[in-house]
Amino acid sequence: MGKFILDSQFAPAGDQPQAIQKITQFIHNGAQYSTLVGVTGSGKTYTMANIIANLNIPTLIMTHNKTLAAQLYSEFRGFFPKNHVEYFISHFDYYQPEAYIPRRDLFIEKDSSINEDLERLRLSATTSLLAYDDIIVIASVSANYGLGNPAEYLTMIHKFEIGQEEAQKTLLLKLVDMGYTRNDTIFERGNFRVNGEVIDIFPAYNEKEFIRIEFFGDEIERIGVFDALERTALTQLESFVLYAANQFIVGAQRLQSAIKNIEVELENRLEEFVSQDKQIEYQRLKTRTEFDLEMIKESGICKGIENYARHLTGKKAGETPYSLLDYFEQKGKPYLLIVDESHVSLPQFGGMYAGDRSRKEVLVEYGFRLPSALDNRPLRFDEFINKAPHFLFVSATPAQKELELSQEHIAEQIIRPTGLLDPLYEVRDADNAVLDLYDEIKARIAKNQRVLITTLTKKMAEELSKYYAELGIKVRYMHSDIDAIERNHLIRALRLGEFDVLIGINLLREGLDLPEVSLIAIMDADKEGFLRSETSLIQTMGRAARNVEGKVILYAKKITGSMQRAFEVTDYRRTKQEEFNRIHNITPKSVQRNVEQELKIESSGLSRLYEKASKKIPKSERESIIKELNIKMHQAAKALEFEEAARLRDEIARIRTM
């Protein structure tokens, strides 16, 4: 079994040593649920890393949004550079699920756009899970959604060995069964190509390397690893294991069984519609399902094939669907599931099932889908919370649910390694908030510090951003329409000083590690509600706890109950921290953290790879690269993807001028 090797120049400090020791002991003693109550800036992520290293078991870390997942992915890759750290979030750039609105007789077709890089990372996560024990997967709520059967996925692997006897035709058919596509013109992820007795395979889960299998007759003579950009040999292998091109691969026998079961279900459902005299629903379901069945018989896939997941995976009606957690269980060993920011993540996990169910029940009732489509769903909360052998809930403000589950298995982490105290806070009159805050912003900019402002409405955030920009402040506005990658870019740009003030609504609370921020301004702090609850206020105020000059200004007309309770928690923690510093003669210092490289994810993996390494492209290779890009450019234009076509055109022009 691979061993986790934690790489850090720091030793645990503050409350970290006792928290690490307690949680490790809880889990060693068999506790299924434990909670780490850690104040903002106390190094909860580093504590988590130490716990993982101590336990030395596969670990899944789940959080409620993609921004935090990206941040955790960067941090854990830094902590465990010699181990396998993977990333598993939704692979959609855009997703509109199918739905039916009866009162308007409006059917909305499913519409989506898959991000190829995110798909590759998801595949990398599942293949690594089956191949390695020293693995950490950072995931969003996507981990709770349906995946293919991991046991079936394991049957869809192929091992190559030097000296192995295998007819080339047989191998090519096997590659197609595994989801790979032959393409002798454009060679990219998920493709293979054939040139005489040489077969090149580009694993769907690999970004930079492809495999070359060289035959002598029907015998494998050589196995090589090649750089996908430079087409140069990297190393020779004695053997190589290839995994399927997607997680929903189904063997021929299972597929035939699924088709038969779908036909039986369709027949039964149509009989129900006849008995209920529902002619429209009858015709609708018959037409749609028979079309899908024809597509599955011909090509093994159809649009919306996930709605037949129950049949394709061999599950029974109502049975728990397969998810990423089953890939951990497939290993047959204990594993740890960490729920980061659990006070937000757990309620979100709990709400996923109900929303999905209500939408699909309408589709089933009106004949758009078979009843089995209801089993293509996220895990219910009761299924999720009993799935893993060991849960660790991590939060500065855990909810009652986590505390009840954990009982006595709770560790506190209030003392920060840096000696930093919970921030000072001040309540100011809301009437003069905008001008008063402008003066505070100018003072912070003069010290090369950053400011976060949280508002209650999108309109106020937009107007405030526009107003301060007109006054010469470098300000940006983070709103809910910004995708995960752009949010990550904004946060990084703030840290680098490309702008000084970031304004948002509820996007500035959990998990944002911003040592450069010394001022948090909370507008309309006295407006009771979700965004100004005790928990939300504590979390928001905590964003200023990574800077020695951290301060929070709450603009309000009165002090609400939520504000008062948040102040009491802050005062309690600050008193305890001051006492610890006094006893140990500690002088508080701001957190020092490098600005990690951005998670490089774009819509066109091929173009990005060429752009990233264009300076390395040998002159002799440029024409072949230009040829490939030119084909992709015309394909994009034909598909009316003009922005992508223009980007590829510019890339071609740039390579030609090198």
Curated annotation (Swiss-Prot):
Domain UVR: residue ranges: 623-658
Annotated localization: Cytoplasm
Leader sequence residues: none
RNA-binding in keyword set: no
Family: Belongs to the UvrB family.
Residues annotated for ATP binding in this entry: 38-45
One of the record's GO molecular function terms: ATP binding
Main location: cytoplasm
Gene Ontology BP, a term: SOS response
Subunit structure: Forms a heterotetramer with UvrA during the search for lesions. Interacts with UvrC in an incision complex.
Keywords associated with the record: ATP-binding, Cytoplasm, DNA damage, DNA excision, DNA repair, Excision nuclease, Nucleotide-binding, SOS response
PANTHER family documented for this protein: UVRABC SYSTEM PROTEIN B (PTHR24029:SF0)
Annotated function: The UvrABC repair system catalyzes the recognition and processing of DNA lesions. A damage recognition complex composed of 2 UvrA and 2 UvrB subunits scans DNA for abnormalities. Upon binding of the UvrA(2)B(2) complex to a putative damaged site, the DNA wraps around one UvrB monomer. DNA wrap is dependent on ATP binding by UvrB and probably causes local melting of the DNA helix, facilitating insertion of UvrB beta-hairpin between the DNA strands. Then UvrB probes one DNA strand for the presence of a lesion.
UniProt cross-references to InterPro entries, sorted A to Z: Helicase/UvrB_N, Helicase_ATP-bd, Helicase_C-like, P-loop_NTPase, UVR_dom, UVR_dom_sf, UvrB, UvrB_inter
Keyword DNA damage on entry: yes
Matches recorded under Gene3D superfamilies: P-loop containing nucleotide triphosphate hydrolases, UVR domain
Domain Helicase ATP-binding stretches: 25-416
Protein's UniProt name: UvrABC system protein B
NCBIfam families: PRK05298.1 (NF003673), uvrb (TIGR00631)
Organism expressing this protein natively: Helicobacter hepaticus (strain ATCC 51449 / 3B1)
Ranges where the Helicase C-terminal domain occurs: 433-607
Origin: domain of life: Bacteria
Matching HAMAP family: UvrB
One of the record's GO cellular component terms: excinuclease repair complex
Domain notes for this protein: The beta-hairpin motif is involved in DNA binding.
